[in-house]
Amino acid sequence: MLKFPPLKPHKPIGNVFVYSQKNSFGSIVYKMANKDGKYVGLMETLPTIVNNKRQSYSPNATSYPSLLIQKLSVGPKRQGFGSAFINIAKKDSFKHFCNGNIHLVASDMYDGLHPPQVFYRKLGFQFNKSSGFTERKVDEFIAGKIPESGLYGLGDTYMFFENNVDKDGKMVEFMKRFKEKFPEIFEWL
């Protein structure tokens, strides 16, 4: 559980264009361009059912719907593009009956000096139960107790944003009936 709320509300990013397309594997690929038409980021998501018997993600359920973020890449960093993609994923999670649940594997393979675990933690993501060491390090960095160099080598970390695990599946069934009755609302999302 988070010991602190997300640090600050994210201001909306103006003048960006986001294009989405479903690929042949069922994933939804989002591409973002700035006002000049320059490519600034990509996110790939897939609605899934998490079979969580080992509780790699949420400790609250063994099987639940969740949106998997397979890939999130932005450049330049620290401009708000990653946060915009996460906000899109949160909305998309409801649109695809995942009840606001998101999960991913944060990896420092591409940028060991600036690990993504800090970014996801600031946005409200939680660590799984076996990532206690990584969780402590990231929380200490966010609190200003250790320098960023102390985060080097965190590796791969299972992280999740849990809204509603819907253990009995009633919420998913309700949302499917709701979508059939009011499809224009889901087109608007």
Model-identified regions with their sequence ranges:
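Non-catalytic substrate-recognition and accessory regions of acyl/acetyltransferase enzymes
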Residues: 1-79, 83-189
